[in-house]
Amino acid sequence: MSIRKLKPTSAGRRFQTVSTFEEITRSEPEKSLTEGITSSCGRNCYGRITSRRRGGGNKRLYRIIDFKRDKFGVPAKVFSIEYDPNRSARIALLHYADGEKRYILAPVGIKVGDMITAGDAADIKPGNALQLKKIPVGTLLHNIELNPGRGGQMCRAAGTYAQLVAKEGKYALLRLPSGEVRNVLSTCLATIGQVGNVMHENISIGKAGRNRWLGKRPEVRGVAMNPVDHPLGGGEGKSSGGRHPVTPWGKPTKGYKTRNKKKPSSKLIVKRRGQK
């Protein structure tokens, strides 16, 4: 994938960059692997906003992705590389030898016609899925399970990967994109390689309207609100808020740790992100 800079025919297009989509081989999704998706606009079942700054955006069809990779020993052929509006990564359509079709995240280096499989007997090549205990130390991984059989939960965004650092007993030590180093059960599945669409992080949105297409609404500063709406609101004229920066619910922001210290998975974290 490469990035194309648009001609500055207007102020909104001056700094805008877009993907060239040269890796896409098919424009229409597999109908049997799509379903409707309804936007809640950040509201819960009572109609109250629980996730701010959401709403609008283009309609989408949800592509059903195989994060579990539980079709062991059955070879599959990469039929197409497709765009997915629900995620930053590209997706690959697999045609299995028994006739089944599934979508997976498309890793770097995968192309139409490649053969992919899952299981302990699979080769160490991009797109194949194995248990962590069967993967050599130093390998780059994505779509990693936290619990065996639950499906991949880590490293699914475009360009991300984790590195297998060591294997000790029933655990495998992984270095995650955030810099965190943590233990994961060695019986968990992971997919070989780095997630594709690596240049996604370098795309410049360029204008506010393009974020609205994605369903993202504006973020209003607390000091611009009324006192009833935010702890930093109110005051005559422009004010600084009069206190250290806080969330709308009064908790300190800018560096305040919010992780629960009693979380059971804390004992699996060897080094927290940001630590040297």
Curated annotation (Swiss-Prot):
<comment type="similarity">
    <text>Belongs to the universal ribosomal protein uL2 family.</text>
</comment>
<dbReference type="InterPro" id="IPR008991">
    <property type="entry name" value="Translation_prot_SH3-like_sf"/>
</dbReference>
<feature type="compositionally biased region" description="Basic residues">
    <location>
        <begin position="254"/>
        <end position="276"/>
    </location>
</feature>
<dbReference type="InterPro" id="IPR005880">
    <property type="entry name" value="Ribosomal_uL2_bac/org-type"/>
</dbReference>
<dbReference type="InterPro" id="IPR014726">
    <property type="entry name" value="Ribosomal_uL2_dom3"/>
</dbReference>
<dbReference type="Pfam" id="PF03947">
    <property type="entry name" value="Ribosomal_L2_C"/>
</dbReference>
<keyword id="KW-0687">Ribonucleoprotein</keyword>
<dbReference type="GO" id="GO:0015934">
    <property type="term" value="C:large ribosomal subunit"/>
</dbReference>
<dbReference type="InterPro" id="IPR022671">
    <property type="entry name" value="Ribosomal_uL2_CS"/>
</dbReference>
<feature type="region of interest" description="Disordered">
    <location>
        <begin position="224"/>
        <end position="276"/>
    </location>
</feature>
<dbReference type="InterPro" id="IPR002171">
    <property type="entry name" value="Ribosomal_uL2"/>
</dbReference>
<dbReference type="GO" id="GO:0002181">
    <property type="term" value="P:cytoplasmic translation"/>
</dbReference>
<dbReference type="InterPro" id="IPR022669">
    <property type="entry name" value="Ribosomal_uL2_C"/>
</dbReference>
<keyword id="KW-0699">rRNA-binding</keyword>
<protein>
    <recommendedName>
        <fullName>Large ribosomal subunit protein uL2</fullName>
    </recommendedName>
</protein>
<keyword id="KW-0694">RNA-binding</keyword>
<comment type="function">
    <text>One of the primary rRNA binding proteins. Required for association of the 30S and 50S subunits to form the 70S ribosome, for tRNA binding and peptide bond formation. It has been suggested to have peptidyltransferase activity; this is somewhat controversial. Makes several contacts with the 16S rRNA in the 70S ribosome.</text>
</comment>
<comment type="subunit">
    <text>Part of the 50S ribosomal subunit. Forms a bridge to the 30S subunit in the 70S ribosome.</text>
</comment>
<dbReference type="GO" id="GO:0016740">
    <property type="term" value="F:transferase activity"/>
</dbReference>
<dbReference type="GO" id="GO:0019843">
    <property type="term" value="F:rRNA binding"/>
</dbReference>
<dbReference type="GO" id="GO:0003735">
    <property type="term" value="F:structural constituent of ribosome"/>
</dbReference>
<keyword id="KW-0689">Ribosomal protein</keyword>
<dbReference type="InterPro" id="IPR012340">
    <property type="entry name" value="NA-bd_OB-fold"/>
</dbReference>
<dbReference type="Pfam" id="PF00181">
    <property type="entry name" value="Ribosomal_L2"/>
</dbReference>
<dbReference type="InterPro" id="IPR022666">
    <property type="entry name" value="Ribosomal_uL2_RNA-bd_dom"/>
</dbReference>
<dbReference type="InterPro" id="IPR014722">
    <property type="entry name" value="Rib_uL2_dom2"/>
</dbReference>
